[in-house]
């Protein structure tokens, strides 16, 4: 008997030990961030990369707060012999299973094809929900951009910024080929990427087939030909929608003839039935118990309706040509490119169609493009037509090199777009 008791005591002690081990196995937020910081140091030593102090300090700061760090920023360090690399941070995130990253900024760090492929493999993992990706001035080539584009089929990035990477038309084609099957990307920035007129058609197809509603293309070489190819389908779609809206309004204002005839026939039938003989129906007044039961049932039904009304599911972004912001400043939209001298007027006439009919358009930037007096006149008439159609006003910015009265009217009807302040430490670089 005493031996049996000892066994039970031993069993209880073993269960307590296992419970303690299980509690120790659970990681807190601070422990997870501490492990991430230590792993980042280890990976930097293994790959001979400079451990960026700002990354370590930001991890330590959130470790003390016991909050998840969502934003990671990488930029060149002070040590030239030991450069900052991207792979140590990504390896540390993967080894610690840190899935709370949402924003990744990489500035002025040269990225080879291997680095871009490592980043693409990281984004293809479904558990890392990166929503904002910024790769600014990283010397990404056209072949590497194609590999990055293939990763956007499986990730949930909503904003992609690839400014100051000279990958040209070939890289733009590879990137857009991968983005065609993406349904989450909303903002695309390709400022100063050496894009030519051929990229206009590629970007136009992208805007009509995906959910991208904001595009930033400042400092490229699209010229009139590229811009026309890009917005041609958008303008046609906006015009078709305007016609459909007008038809719906006409149908709502004019009542259908069939409904009027049906109402008259119903009224005549009820009057004829009222004149005929009817047997009186005896209705019993409900008792107090029945009344209380009815009121309770009504209250229950109302409560259920309130609960169901609170649950609102966010709909995914609309796929199609729903453009809201177009930034094409400094793109050579003038009469000096290939084509006739009227090419800026033709381009502005197409933009006029888009501005006049699109109900979702909010912003257009045409600064540093010599569109001329005729082009400015087309834009002014577009703003006036939009006002007559009672659509929401848009922000429009153009060059001042045109007729002074035309420019003043453009500022009056389409002003409001402010120049964004340049970020400290990044002179000359424009951010979204």
Q: Where do the model's predicted regions map?
A:
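Leucine-rich tandem repeat or coiled-coil scaffolds
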Residues: 1-432
